[in-house]
Amino acid sequence: HPNLPETVEIADGVNVKHLVAGPFEGLSKEELPSQLGALTSSFMNYQKQLPNDYYSLLHSHYWISGQLGWMVSERTGTPLIHTMHTTAKVKNLNLADSEKPEPQTRAIGEEQVVKASTGLIANTDAEAASLVSLYDACPDNVFVVAPGVDLESFSPADGKAAARVRLDIALDAIMLTFVGRIQPHK
């Protein structure tokens, strides 16, 4: 996005580099793979100013970024760690009646990323098992890292009880929160 800074340091020695890759809006999820060339070009232009051993580790998310990570990993000899989040094969096995299946090109791209990765991060044991059973990932290279929340940063300013009172929820009510799209595999 044009309003983002070029680089953001999120921790000591950990930077997020924003790359320009295609239009800033108006693309559907299905159209994103068409921007892989633009993403690759943008990264390669950035990377040519760096030595090949600049990175100790690459970590990509979602299959499209994984494709770029695979190429950079092969080019530089840097290990690639990848997090899928969702996969075409799992989604296609659990489609709701009205849902359109994920394209075969995505499944193929995911298979390539799995094979090219030094390690794969899954959020759950079920996700790890699907990487092994559906994508032939080596079980020794799949690591479960459950997502979490920093409760010091993200907590009600005046406590849970006050939040429940504001929302008119009984203090002893059991609460469940779901954040995400409602899909059968989730």
Language model regions located:
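Active-site proximal beta-strand in glycosyltransferases
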Residues: 59, 73-93, 103, 121
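Short hydrophobic "strand-cap" motifs at the C-terminus of beta-strands
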Residues: 123, 145, 178-180
